[in-house]
């Protein structure tokens, strides 16, 4: 009986200690769960903050890059961009008219002659009459003196200024670039030139432009010395096409693209001819390979030895 009573007391003490330990363990477990939830929330907030900071940093870098290098110009569907596409010659003629009446007073095209326009935008008689309107300093004559004469087809387009110093003095220190190769000299050339000519707008809030400059987001730095030159009805086209800002921009870009690559149509035609000839040669080689040489290659010789 004594032994049984002792055993019962030991069991009661063990059960009592387990009942006391259970709330303590549950308290520690709940505290750990709360700590895990809190640390997860802190990690989520940290990740969110890092993402927002990265996004803001990227936006700042992108804005700074656009301000330094200019806004990326959109892509436009130029008719001469296709593999077998050619220039719009009517647009080239109108673009030359825009260059003469709007651009030639400041920008030169020193690599283009009047004879280059023959068969592209004008007849030979029209080009001769156009060249005769300018005066060219030539010589020396038999007396050793220089003289002036009417222009000829072989003459280059006239220069608006005698030298670079005169050009900078007339344009407030800015030097108008030569336009002969402008669409090849600029990244994304035709799209950039069109976006630049039609992209003038008022500067946004917080941006100040120095006097004598004009805001254009497509120009590196955003400030350009050239004012907006393409305004509706700035020229009167010979063929009656409405001279809107976008139309004049398209035409002058077509003219400048031709000036930079006058051989493009001939190059594309020659490439197509070579591709056609090489395709015929490939078909002929495949024919001989399949029907001629395969027979010889698979031929077997049987040697019959007579005893």
Curated annotation (Swiss-Prot):
Residues 90-246 form the Cytochrome c domain. It is a single-pass membrane protein. The keyword Membrane applies. It comes from the Eukaryota. The keyword Isomerase does not apply. GO terms for molecular function: electron transfer activity; heme binding; metal ion binding. PROSITE patterns: CYTC (PS51007). The chain crosses the membrane at residues 271-288. Keywords: Electron transport, Heme, Iron, Membrane, Metal-binding, Mitochondrion, Mitochondrion inner membrane, Respiratory chain, Transit peptide, Transmembrane, Transmembrane helix, Transport. Component of the ubiquinol-cytochrome c oxidoreductase (cytochrome b-c1 complex, complex III, CIII), a multisubunit enzyme composed of 10 subunits. The complex is composed of 3 respiratory subunits cytochrome b (MT-CYB), cytochrome c1 (CYC1-1 or CYC1-2) and Rieske protein (UCR1-1 or UCR1-2), 2 core protein subunits MPPalpha1 (or MPPalpha2) and MPPB, and 5 low-molecular weight protein subunits QCR7-1 (or QCR7-2), UCRQ-1 (or UCRQ-2), QCR9, UCRY and probably QCR6-1 (or QCR6-2). Component of the ubiquinol-cytochrome c oxidoreductase, a multisubunit transmembrane complex that is part of the mitochondrial electron transport chain which drives oxidative phosphorylation. This is Cytochrome c1 1, heme protein, mitochondrial. It comes from Arabidopsis thaliana (Mouse-ear cress). The lineage of its organism: Eukaryota, Viridiplantae, Streptophyta, Embryophyta, Tracheophyta.
């Amino acid at each position: 009986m004594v032994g049984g009573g002792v055993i019962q007391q030991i069991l009661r003490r063990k059960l009592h200690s387990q009942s006391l330990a259970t709330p303590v363990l549950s308290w520690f477990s709940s505290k750990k769960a709360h700590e895990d939830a809190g640390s997860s929330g802190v990690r989520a907030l940290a990740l969110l903050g890092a993402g927002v900071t990265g996004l803001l940093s990227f936006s700042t870098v992108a804005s700074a890059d656009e301000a330094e290098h200019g806004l990326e110009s959109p892509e436009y569907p130029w008719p001469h961009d296709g593999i077998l596409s050619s220039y719009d010659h009517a647009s080239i003629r109108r673009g030359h008219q825009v260059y003469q009446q709007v651009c030639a007073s400041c920008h030169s095209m020193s690599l283009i002659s009047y004879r280059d326009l023959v068969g592209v935008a004008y007849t030979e008689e029209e080009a001769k009459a156009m060249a005769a309107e300018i005066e060219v300093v030539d010589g020396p004559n038999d007396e050793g003196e220089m003289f002036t004469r009417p222009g000829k087809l072989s003459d280059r387009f006239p220069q608006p200024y005698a030298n670079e110093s005169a050009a900078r003095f007339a344009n407030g220190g800015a030097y108008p670039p030569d336009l002969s190769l402008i669409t090849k000299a600029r990244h994304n050339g035709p799209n950039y030139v069109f976006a630049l000519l039609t992209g003038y707008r008022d500067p946004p809030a917080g941006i100040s432009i120095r006097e004598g400059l004009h805001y254009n987001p497509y120009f590196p730095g955003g400030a350009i010395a050239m004012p907006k030159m393409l305004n509706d009805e700035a020229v009167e086209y010979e063929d009656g096409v409405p001279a809107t800002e976008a139309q004049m921009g398209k035409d002058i870009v077509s003219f400048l693209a031709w000036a930079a690559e006058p051989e493009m149509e001939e190059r594309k035609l020659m490439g197509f001819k070579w591709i056609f000839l090489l395709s015929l040669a490939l078909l002929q080689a495949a024919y001989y390979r399949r029907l001629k040489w395969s027979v010889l290659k698979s031929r077997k010789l049987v040697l019959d030895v007579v005893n």
